[in-house]
């Protein structure tokens, strides 16, 4: 398997007044193409901070991240934005859909940002919404959708550019068990069919156990589950 993501000796400090607070401590690991990886840990352990750094949304104090052999720390702002748009997908606990746009328009957005033709973007967005079982909801705005439907739209948006890696921060945290199971089945299906790698941050140990690899974050230190 091909190495997709490499994270080496990542540490992160935040300044709080005269004190320096360490959130991540010398974190190193890799993910291969098509990997299904979970990171579990208590609140405040550094999981979300790590995910933001891996996605180029935050910078480490020390250390380096590579995606497809490109160092995020060596990219310009424009190059980093292009990499995020083309190679990464993001799913959050809160869907972050734009309230004034339909499900279709929300899913089209990453392609429009990438300057794709509007008609082609609409066609691809509709196909992706069909893939997540929402072909009957494409013209609905987020307020008219259930929590599970909104999260499915968010997943469709994350996947529409066919990223190599999806970073998901508590993607099922606000969902009931039945919806959580359906979301996982969707992730597994897309992983198999499109070889997309997923890195999920979750408190749900049952969900984490279904993935092929589990990492544990505690006090900013990451280790493999035994």
Swiss-Prot record:
Keyword ATP-binding: yes
Cited PANTHER family: IMPORT ATP-BINDING PROTEIN, LIPOPROTEIN-RELEASING SYSTEM ATP-BINDING PROTEIN LOLD
GO cellular component: plasma membrane
TM spans (from-to): none
Main localization (coarse): membrane
SMART domains: AAA
PROSITE patterns with a match to the protein in the record: ABC_TRANSPORTER_1 (PS00211), ABC_TRANSPORTER_2 (PS50893), LOLD (PS51244)
GO BP of this protein: lipoprotein localization to outer membrane; protein localization to outer membrane
Localisation per UniProt entry: Cell inner membrane
EC id: 7.6.2.-
Top-level class of the enzyme under EC nomenclature: translocase
Main function: Part of the ABC transporter complex LolCDE involved in the translocation of mature outer membrane-directed lipoproteins, from the inner membrane to the periplasmic chaperone, LolA. Responsible for the formation of the LolA-lipoprotein complex in an ATP-dependent manner.
Keyword Cell inner membrane: yes
Membrane topology, from the record: Peripheral membrane protein
Residues the entry annotates as binding ATP: 41-48
Protein name according to UniProt: Lipoprotein-releasing system ATP-binding protein LolD
Binding partners and assembly: The complex is composed of two ATP-binding proteins (LolD) and two transmembrane proteins (LolC and LolE).
Phylogenetic lineage: Bacteria, Pseudomonadati, Pseudomonadota, Gammaproteobacteria, Pasteurellales
Chain ranges of the ABC transporter domain: 5-226
UniProt keyword terms in alphabetical order: ATP-binding, Cell inner membrane, Cell membrane, Membrane, Nucleotide-binding, Translocase, Transport
